[in-house]
Curated annotation (Swiss-Prot):
GO function terms (MF aspect): ADP binding; ATP binding; phosphotransferase activity, phosphate group as acceptor; protein serine/threonine kinase activity
Sites where the protein binds ADP: G156, V157, S158, R159, S160, G161, K162, T163
Swiss-Prot/TrEMBL catalytic activity: N(tele)-phospho-L-histidyl/L-threonyl-[pyruvate, phosphate dikinase] + ADP = N(tele)-phospho-L-histidyl/O-phospho-L-threonyl-[pyruvate, phosphate dikinase] + AMP + H(+); N(tele)-phospho-L-histidyl/O-phospho-L-threonyl-[pyruvate, phosphate dikinase] + phosphate + H(+) = N(tele)-phospho-L-histidyl/L-threonyl-[pyruvate, phosphate dikinase] + diphosphate
Species assigned in the record: Cutibacterium acnes (strain DSM 16379 / KPA171202)
Superkingdom to which the source organism belongs: Bacteria
Keyword set, alphabetical order: Kinase, Nucleotide-binding, Serine/threonine-protein kinase, Transferase
Task of the protein: Bifunctional serine/threonine kinase and phosphorylase involved in the regulation of the pyruvate, phosphate dikinase (PPDK) by catalyzing its phosphorylation/dephosphorylation.
The name this protein goes by in its record: Putative pyruvate, phosphate dikinase regulatory protein
Source taxonomy: Bacteria, Bacillati, Actinomycetota, Actinomycetes, Propionibacteriales
Amino acid sequence: MAESPLEIHVIADSTGETAVRLARAARSQFEGVHWHIVRHPMIGTVPEMVSALEAVSEAHEAGQWVCVVHTLVLPDMRRMVSDACEEMGIRELDLMGPMLEAMEEASGLDADAVPRRPVGVEADYFTRISAMEFAVRNDDGAIPDRLTEADICLVGVSRSGKTPLSIYLGYLGYKTVNVPLVPGIAPPTELAAVDRWRIVGLTIDAQRLLEIRGRRVRGLGGFGNEDGYADLAAIYEELDEVGKIQRRLGCPIIDTTGLALEESATKVIDVVDQRAKTAGTRLRKPAGSYRMRP
């Protein structure tokens, strides 16, 4: 491990947030190494660029490992960084140039090359905010009358991951509700009005559920363990009974044990999307939606 921070210098003609996020994502893959991100934003003139490159040079001459990541619209500015880094023997990553060149080639047009041009609010920004608020307001089936407004409806035992998954699906732009299923208690009658293809059951390994519930009970000072809430034998029975309810509902069941939130979300979206097609309809796609395949 390096004795001093390894420096990633971000040079940008705007905020530099795009490059910073990429640098942070890459940095997360190196545990135990101290990577320091140095930002040089709003670089619009040659003197400003010279000042930024001097800071890079000083760090390099001090014996630190340094690399430069930049998002610059103007070709001359990109060339200035590239030439300086080559002269200093420093690794340099141009995030903007190759993208602009590819788009110019594909469109047959020249880029406007206007620094600091506002990119505007994402087309799906307000959709995502609204969907996340919807998930929070309708957590644990709080407002049964609104179940039919959801794009996706999650059903399962308490602490099977329904709430965080609902909010994450909301972040992706899908209005999601979650309904707790409890043995001996009938699901809300409003659930019958929800399209079958929208409903997904969640389950989880009994031992894992015991660990999660045990932490919650300890956090409450031992309260909340009534009716075997954190008892393994009772949990096995609960999962079995809730599984029967889920099968009566005719919904697919996804085991969330060991799955990252993103993986669970992808599985839910895939299964709902496929069931919607089978039903002769389709799951609403949020504007600008995207998701990573596991």
